[in-house]
Regions:
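Conserved, mostly hydrophobic/aromatic
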Residues: 67, 95, 141, 154, ...
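Glycoside hydrolase catalytic-domain groove-lining segments
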Residues: 180-181, 185-273, 323-329
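Active-site groove signature of glycoside hydrolases
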Residues: 73, 109-114, 134-169, 306
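N-terminal Sec-pathway targeting helices
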Residues: 1-15
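Aromatic-lined substrate-binding rim segments of carbohydrate-active enzymes
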Residues: 25-28, 52-118, 166-193, 207, ...
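Short, acidic/polar
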Residues: 45-61, 133-144, 196-205, 286-296
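Hydrophobic faces of well-ordered beta-strands that scaffold small-molecule active sites
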Residues: 33-39, 67-69, 102-106, 152-156, ...
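Substrate-binding cleft of secreted/luminal carbohydrate-active enzymes
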Residues: 107, 152, 257-334
Length: 334
C-alpha cells in the first residue's frame, strides 16, 4: 500500500509540474510547422460525398501538400488474387501532379472504424492463411508504388498496440515485426509506426519505428462515462517524448523523428458522425475547439502534424452550410 501511495504522490507531482511547465511554453512558429491531412475514401463516401470531388478540393482549394493515403486491403484486393489499384492510383497520381508528399499506410489495422479492414473473402480463412494473404497484399502495394518519389514514408498498421479499440484481433507482435521487415526489404524509405497519444506508453511502437507517429485527441466519448476531455497539458506530450527516449536508447543517441499522425479535428460521439445531429457533433468538436486543438499541437512541440477530419469539414461546408472549418484551414493552416 505504501508503494502505491508513493507512486500516486509521484504522479501528482509530475502532473502539477507539467501544468506549471505549460505556462512557460509558447506555440511553435507557424513557419516551422508542416501540416497535412489524412484522406479516407470510404469515410468520404459514408458522408455522402463524391470522393474524387472532395479529394481534388483538398489538393486544389486547401492546397494541402502533405497527405496520408490509405491502401485499404478490401479496396485493393476485393477478390482473392484480383487486385484493383485504380482508386488508389488516382489519389497518388493527383497528389504527384501537385507536388504533394505522401504517407502511404498499409496493413490490416488502418485508419477509420472498424479499425481493422479485411476483405470479405477472408472471412472463413484461419488466421495463418489470412496473415499470408495480408503479406501478399502489402508486398504488391509496396512494389507498385516504390518508384513514386512523392511517397516519403510507409506506415505499417495503425496504432497496432492499442488493442482495446476497434473490431480487431489481438496484435501479434511477432507478425507485426514480420510486416515491418517485409516493407524494409522492399524499399529503403522510413517506416512509420504509430501509437495512441493519451493512454499508450509508446515504447513498443517507437522502438520499431523509423519515424514515430502519435495521435492527439482532446475530447472523446466513452461508454459508460459519456463525453470526456483529457485533462492533459500540451507538455504531457513533451514529457512522454523525453521518457520514451530513455527506454528506446535515443536519449544519448540519434533521436527519431516524431510526428502527430492524427490531430483531432472532427467530432468523437456515441455514434458515427452521420447519425449525430449537428448540435451533437459540436459537443466534442466546435469551431473554437478546432482552433484550440491546432494551438495545442503547436505547443506540444512536434513540427509535423496531420489533421484528422478533412472530409467532415467539407461535409459541413457543402451539406450543413457551415464553411468556417474549411475556410479557416484554407486561410490559416495550409
Amino acid at each position: 500500500f505504501q508503494i502505491l501511495l508513493y507512486l500516486l504522490v509521484l504522479i501528482l507531482v509530475i502532473y502539477f509540474f507539467l501544468w506549471i511547465w505549460n505556462f512557460f511554453i509558447d506555440e511553435l512558429p507557424q513557419d516551422q510547422m508542416v501540416y497535412g491531412v489524412t484522406f479516407s475514401k470510404p469515410y468520404a463516401v459514408e458522408l455522402g460525398l463524391d470522393w474524387k470531388e472532395i479529394y481534388l478540393a483538398i489538393l486544389d482549394d486547401l492546397k494541402v501538400k502533405n497527405i496520408r493515403l490509405i491502401a485499404y486491403w478490401p479496396e485493393v484486393e476485393p477478390k482473392e488474387g484480383k487486385f484493383d489499384f485504380r482508386d488508389l492510383d488516382f489519389q497518388i497520381n493527383e497528389a504527384v501532379k501537385r507536388n504533394a508528399k505522401i504517407i502511404l499506410a498499409v496493413g490490416r489495422r488502418l485508419p477509420r472504424w472498424p479499425e481493422c479492414h479485411e476483405p470479405s473473402w477472408t472471412l472463413n480463412q484461419n488466421l495463418e492463411v489470412k496473415n499470408e494473404k495480408l503479406l501478399e497484399y502489402i508486398e504488391k502495394t509496396i512494389l507498385r508504388y516504390k518508384e513514386v518519389e512523392a511517397i516519403k514514408y510507409w506506415q505499417v498498421e495503425n496504432e497496432p498496440f492499442l488493442m482495446r479499440f476497434g473490431i480487431c484481433p489481438k496484435t501479434n507482435i511477432e507478425f507485426l515485426d514480420k510486416e515491418i521487415a517485409l516493407v524494409h526489404s522492399l524499399d529503403s524509405r522510413p517506416v512509420i509506426i504509430s501509437d495512441n497519444g493519451e493512454v499508450s506508453i509508446w515504447i513498443n511502437a517507437r522502438k520499431r519505428a523509423d519515424v514515430f507517429g502519435t495521435t492527439m485527441y482532446r475530447v472523446i466519448w466513452k461508454k459508460p462515462f459519456g463525453y470526456f476531455r483529457y485533462p492533459l497539458p500540451s507538455t504531457f506530450f513533451r514529457f512522454k517524448d523525453f521518457v520514451s527516449k530513455i527506454f528506446t536508447g535515443e536519449l544519448f543517441g540519434q533521436p527519431k523523428k516524431v510526428i502527430v499522425i492524427e490531430l483531432q479535428a472532427e467530432p468523437w460521439g456515441p455514434e458515427v458522425t452521420t447519425r449525430l445531429t449537428l448540435e451533437e457533433q459540436f459537443v466534442s468538436m466546435d469551431f473554437e475547439g478546432f482552433k484550440g486543438n491546432i494551438g495545442y499541437a503547436r505547443r506540444a512541440g512536434f513540427k509535423e502534424v496531420y489533421l484528422w477530419g478533412v472530409e467532415w469539414w467539407y461535409w459541413l461546408k457543402e451539406k450543413a452550410n457551415e464553411p468556417r472549418f474549411w475556410e479557416f484551414a484554407k486561410s490559416k493552416i495550409f
